[in-house]
């Protein structure tokens, strides 16, 4: 993608408000291209979290994030979940 190329060219650090804005823009574009309503994305996020907490203890102080990424004509749902450990009953 163009953003990735620019990032490689300028070798920017991935911190700060510019990165947050870029990530939000990517999410908006991906949602727009896949025609998924923001409410649907939020529902997907809640359902993913419901399943994950059945099997893992998560770190509630860390950010749980679900994003859509579009690359080479396909879209992927990416979940970033801060997991502390597997629940003992599933070991």
Curated annotation (Swiss-Prot):
Ranges in a coiled coil: none
Listed Pfam families: MinE (PF03776)
GO terms (BP aspect): division septum site selection; regulation of division septum assembly
A Gene Ontology cellular-component term: plasma membrane
Keywords per UniProt: Cell cycle, Cell division
Tree of life domain: Bacteria
InterPro entries noted in UniProt: MinE, MinE_sf
NCBIfam families hit by this protein: minE
Family named by the database record: Belongs to the MinE family.
HAMAP family: MinE
Purpose: Prevents the cell division inhibition by proteins MinC and MinD at internal division sites while permitting inhibition at polar sites. This ensures cell division at the proper site by restricting the formation of a division septum at the midpoint of the long axis of the cell.
Protein name as it appears in the record: Cell division topological specificity factor
Protein source organism: Gloeobacter violaceus (strain ATCC 29082 / PCC 7421)
